[in-house]
Curated annotation (Swiss-Prot):
The gene is recR. This is Recombination protein RecR. One of its GO terms (molecular function) is DNA binding. GO terms for biological process: DNA recombination; DNA repair. HAMAP family: RecR. It comes from Pseudomonas savastanoi pv. phaseolicola (strain 1448A / Race 6). Pfam families: RecR_C, RecR_HhH, RecR_ZnF, Toprim_4.
Amino acid sequence: MSFSPLIRQLIDAFRVLPGVGQKTAQRMALQLLERDRSGGSRLALALGQAMDGVGHCRSCRTLTEEELCPQCADPRRDDTLLCVVEGPTDVYAVEQTGYRGRYFVLKGHLSPLDGLGPEAIGIPQLMERISQQGTFTEVILATNPTVEGEATAHYIAQLLHEKGLVASRIAHGVPLGGELDLVDGGTLAHSFAGRKPIAL
């Protein structure tokens, strides 16, 4: 079926979302145009406001509308623990466990084949944050339990070891090859309780 230029543009816009293919994008676009124009208007408004108003926390780099996210602005958090995650969705997953320390959000994981080295994902900024803060006694590496996540954790652990800092890895109650934001809170809490130092 051939769509008009504006409908094609809307379909292509939906396809930028993860997991949305051609057919799903068509269904979404046609649903909004045929049956829910007010929903489409709300979506456009919310998307525009979020794109303009949401940035990154200057401390941990998660998504927020403020200079500091709620976790970084909270003075009751434990300043001796730093949890390193791959992305903002992982912060929300870890929060479900009752973790009360600080965070640092990488921009993904090391992936040399995709051209993502330490600088691209923010490892120099992580090391700078650790040096500047000076209060962390343990850095919890909560990268995803994938090959790339494990490589990223090992790389960071080596850097921390050179500075005499303790690095721990969340236990593997999280399924291998899984994503943190898809794991239930109980499993993730168990993984945190069973974390162990990384042997180098």
